[in-house]
Amino acid sequence: MKEYRVYLERARSRQQDFLYPLIFREYIYGLAYSHNFNRSIFVENGGYDNKYSLLNVKRLITRMYQQNHLIISTNDSNKNPFLVYNKNFYSQIISEGFAIVVEIPFFLQLSSSLEEAEIIKSYKNVRSIHSIFPFLEDKFTYLNYVSDIRIPYPIHLEILVQILRYWVKDVPFFHLLRXFLYDFCNWNCFTSTKKSISTFSKSNPRLFLFLYNFYVCEYESIFLFLRNKSSHLRLKSFSVFFERIFFYAKRKHLVEVFSKDFSYTLPFFKDPNIHYVRYQGKCILASKNVPFLMNKWKHYFIHLWQCFFDVWSQPRTIDINQLSEHSFQLLGYFSNVRLNRSVVRSQMLENTFLIEIVSKKLDIIVPIIPLIRSLAKAKFCNVLGHPISKPVWADSSDFDIIERFLRICRNLSHYYNGSSKKKSLYRIKYILRLSCIKTLACKHKSTVRAFLKRSGSEELLEEFFTEEEEILSLIFPRDSFTLHRFHRNRIWYLDILFSNDLVNDE
């Protein structure tokens, strides 16, 4: 990253950032594959392939600029199936290059913003998705209504490119990016626009996620502006956001033109207790007041997407429910606000009476069915949750096989350790334990019972059910009050940076 910083500082001296030459740097593709940000719990990271060399990248970009290569009919692809493989190969290589190059200037801007805010030491915790749950535990127990909102996809990839243009002023880079996107759309011209965007997001996940985040960031900028104007409270947690020149220009124009209308409109949005949480393409809006204000914000979202971003969304796709009666899904958890009722006997002089106390608690549950579905997809069990062997790993040593299964168990245990009820998590560990035993038995061409009797692997596999206090006992004494308090309460690991499959499957 230091080399990128020096290169971009030299480019800034020419009053603009030049990203186009970075596409032809071979170490860009090595960095993209060695730092795979989209790694999964169930699948190990892949290494850097030598096919992604500088010479191949130059050839692919030259072919992409050629007119005959840009448009390939469906009949040609049917005649020559090798074209399909080549197109996927071209798309994967150049997409990885685009993604890693376009992230560089924004990472440097974020680093400088964090340094100015003097929070660079806590940057790892800021990046953690688990920092959302302490916020939910602290705020949502005082709220009454919640609305699950799925942010709609843009109707065309050109909208994503237009938003990015206001941040980066490198014309050749955008020519190449637009040619790449139109090349992909022409290749998928026999499908609908929505199907084409969905295909692009699956085949080029990192580039699409980066462009999509900018689209969401623009819509959230307008939302946060109105939310701050309509509330007496200010959102201090967004002080490290990037500066958006285009957004401030729109806001200035909006205030000048509609200043009179704002004085009449904003009182309808007075809601100091509204809370907004968003991860990827899903957001949750919660409030303490009556559903009338929630409906106001609901229609505001609909009109914002339709008028400013040309995205069609139906009002019936946004539901408003009571928190005490509705569970919402976020980040691979099922969450709801549970009412705890307790009765206290009180006595005043000679009179005795009962007082019923109702308290709220955020209940976060491990979703057993989606977890089993993910394990079945990774070939650890069938759709009913019955463990099966993993023959693909049978060529590895016994130690490597056990270590792979233990790594998955540790990741799942850390990810779901903050849940209220862990019975589902113990069942998942049991499935992985039997799958590990069956894999070892398959490798040694034996039955499970004979393998366990011969090798005595039961003691070796006990680590699957290692409790959290055994890990914490390395830090605190076993008889300490802190250790017992941690055992009773749930623990959020705020430095978890990997992505959970269930988060992406929501």
Curated annotation (Swiss-Prot):
GO cellular component: chloroplast
A Pfam family annotated for this UniProt entry: Intron_maturas2
One Gene Ontology biological process: tRNA processing
Compartments where located: Plastid, Chloroplast
Keyword tRNA processing: yes
Segments passing through the bilayer: none
Alphabetically ordered keywords of this record: Chloroplast, mRNA processing, Plastid, RNA-binding, tRNA processing
Highest taxon of source: Eukaryota
A GO term for molecular function: RNA binding
Chief place of localization: plastid
Family: Belongs to the intron maturase 2 family. MatK subfamily.
Function: Usually encoded in the trnK tRNA gene intron. Probably assists in splicing its own and other chloroplast group II introns.
HAMAP family: MatK (MF_01390)
The protein's name in its UniProt record: Maturase K
Organism annotation: Trifolium fragiferum (Strawberry clover)
